[in-house]
Structures are given as C-alpha cells and as structure tokens.
Amino acid sequence: MKFAIQSRRDAQSNELMELAKTYLQDFGLTYDEEAPEIVVSIGGDGTLLHAFHRYSHLLDQVAFVGIHTGHLGFYADWKPSELEKLVLSIAKKDFNVVEYPLLEVKVEHHNAASNTYLALNEATVKSPDVTLVMDVELNGNQFERNRGDGHSVSTPSGSTAYNKALGGAIIHPTLAALQITEIASINNRVFRTVGSPLILPAHHHCVLRPVNEQNFNMTVDHLQITQGDVKAIVFNVANERVRFARFRPFPFWERVHESFVANE
C-alpha cells in the first residue's frame, strides 16, 4: 500500500510525521506523495483540509485519516499516543472506508472560461468593499434578492464550522445536501429575505447572480480566491465524494457533543 503524510509543520506534528513514516515503511508500505492510497493528516482539521485539496484529483483512490495534535477535530480522531496502534491497523488494512458528500462551486464569467472548485467544508462569497446584492435562484427559479455581507454554502460535514457560527443547522454528514446561509443580510420594511438557512437535497442546485458588483472575495475551505467579471456562481452537491479510513466507531453526534456541549 502507498501512503503519504500531511503535517501541520509544528514541532510535535513533524516529529509524529517522521515516526509514522518510519513505522509504516518498516511494515513494508511505500511512501508516495504523488499517488497515495491513504493519506495521514497530522495536526488538526485545517491540516486535513490542506491534504484534501492537495489530493482532490485522486478522490476515487485515496482515503484520509487524521491524528490531532491539538483539540479533538471532526476529521482527526486519533491521539498522538495512539500512533503505533494506528500504524498497525493501516499495515493490516484493518479499516472500512466511509464516504461523505462534497460541494461543487462553478464560477461563470462574462468574458472568460468558468472555474470549478470542490469544497470539503464550505465556500463563501463576499464583497470586498460594499454591500453585496445577489439574486438567489433555486433550481432555475428566482427565490429572493439578498443584500448583505454575502453567503456561505456548506457541506454536511462542514455544517459544524463557519456555517454553525452563522446560525446554520448541523447536518449529519451521510446526508447528501448543501446548506445556504446568509451573512448579515439586511431585512427591513423595504428589503426582505427569508432570513433562514436553506437546506437543498442532492438533486437541487443554487445560483447566485450579482446585481451590480461583479468582483468578489471567495473562499473555498481555507483557500482565498479573488473573482472578477462574475456572471453567476453555481452550487451543487458534487459527483465526487471524500473517502475516510475508519478504524473504529467515530459517532458524529458524539463529536458534536464533545465539541460544543461537554465540559472539559
């Protein structure tokens, strides 16, 4: 089996990376950064996001697993003290693969080819200077005109991140859906929106069309992308899925409880 390792690059993560690399090679596995079958992320959820985008062109063959060197994450459930146990499980191929849905973001331009991105957590659209005015279309039909700071569109697995901070719902990651959440929308007697997050199933899509401003600051997970000359931004549940190597039960609602409810 071929493997690669993504480190957060702090001292502890780098030390664990070297240990993991040595142990796995001792078991006969091959270190291959170009075409791995399993990627070990050592750091936090942000580190795994970096690993996901690094290998987003290999999603049909690569599975991810995370070791957290900070707080327990939604993607990283192994502790540094469990490294040897994890290595042994990888060497024995003693794991199942679970798949979660992703978000496809297609940016259409007036005078250039479109750009397409995949997000594991979310994509956001914001104006760099002024109030952002966007027409929101659902399945080809005008739904509302939004005035505010922008929109966040999240995956189910990303619903516990920025989406939750905006008041969005938490969605179990096995559900193929996307969630559209307003960012500081203006609602008064003149300007009105639904004022609530919208959850769309896999066979639905959302289009944001700029009314005036055509230059935006976009994020796709941790990536920051400036977009100009924008005609429309189309959001779908992607055909691709992310694959995680699961070695033991990792109940989603338990993670939610530990992250947001339980006392230290």
Swiss-Prot record:
Catalysis performed (reactions): NAD(+) + ATP = ADP + NADP(+) + H(+)
Essential cofactor(s): a divalent metal cation
Annotated SUPFAM superfamilies: NAD kinase/diacylglycerol kinase-like (SSF111331)
InterPro entries: ATP-NAD_kinase_N, ATP-NAD_kinase_PpnK-typ_C, NAD/diacylglycerol_kinase_sf, NADK
EC number: 2.7.1.23
GO term, biological process aspect, one: NAD metabolic process
Matches recorded under Gene3D superfamilies: Probable inorganic polyphosphate/atp-NAD kinase, domain 1 (3.40.50.10330), Probable inorganic polyphosphate/atp-NAD kinase, domain 2 (2.60.200.30)
Source organism of the structure: Lysinibacillus sphaericus (strain C3-41)
Family the UniProt entry places it in: Belongs to the NAD kinase family.
PANTHER family: NAD KINASE
A Pfam family hit: NAD_kinase_C
Gene: nadK
GO molecular function, one term: metal ion binding
Function recorded in the entry: Involved in the regulation of the intracellular balance of NAD and NADP, and is a key enzyme in the biosynthesis of NADP. Catalyzes specifically the phosphorylation on 2'-hydroxyl of the adenosine moiety of NAD to yield NADP.
UniProt keyword annotations, A-Z: ATP-binding, Cytoplasm, Kinase, NAD, NADP, Nucleotide-binding, Transferase
Keyword Nucleotide-binding: yes
Name recorded for this polypeptide: NAD kinase
